């Protein structure tokens, strides 16, 4: 903003001044060249989309308030596109009726709108943004996987040409996009808003929200009986550990959420030294959740929630970090009291365990099994997904195979945020005076200054040099 690159017009919405627009145009051209090189065909799809299109896929209801919904003057439900899977299927549904036309890929560089609750970080987390989104269509999963690998390599070339060879790909969660496999392209930087787990032993990389959390527990030699002890003012794991002289890994803590669909409570129990992954929880439940506002009517005793004697009418889940443990400390569901000696199977009956925890720093790598995980901050600059038949099946896209049978094609999708990419280049390529743009995307190649503009000879020489540079195709700021 201070450098004259952009100006805010509303929360999370910016106008671009000429220097930034020149940068983003060059980034867009690099992206176009690499998408064309892998057989992409550029199209343009509307920003405003009918709600009925999103109803076909089921996302009109399943996606939360980040999707901006409104009605036109006739009362027809409409949305502002935050992603274009539905529009892409609608665009090629008739074209893709015969197997001979596969595989193919379409892409666009288009404005999108996502109604972020907390826009932040300049162009990193905005509400209106420009994105390259591409969609590929295939007759087999094997063909999709081959093209997915080609697109992965194309992304590596894009980021290298843009001046960000440091970008790495990490395994990620598919989230609302659906599908079986996805990767995020991350710039590792302390300014990042995402957490990335990297194994120092085998090189495994993943977003901590998606990485499998492996916990190894040694069962105690002797099980203690379940006992209730008074723990005044021990509302947190830290306070509880200090009061009872235990470590967080010896605690069974409760994290409470509410389902966005009906507001019902979800109580997740996990080991006290771990954090819950809201992404994993959402995927398991099949609906969005939010941290709960615990009210007296809920029957929950905040700070003292435990699995023994917990009130009914809510979903209760257990993380795999508790499997095989014993002699745990947990809430007693009474204000100011905890229980010691908890062994879940003995005290709660049959328990099902699932992975709901974030992979922690120093944790065990899910690939090589070594405790060599290091967690770093990162900014996501791109993503790729193998969507399978999630959208084509729901929206009735079919093709006729060589044997005359109708089949459903599978899809991949591939996104890059153009403004976010520019912001990331600026984040790592700057000095005390401002951005140091790589030549390939710099707004101008030469900054020509006439230091004695009041001298006719100097001014004439500067003008002549400016004209000569322009004639030879050099971009000059004068």
Q: Regions from the language model: what does each represent?
A:
Residues 1-478:
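NTP/phosphate- and nucleic-acid-binding module
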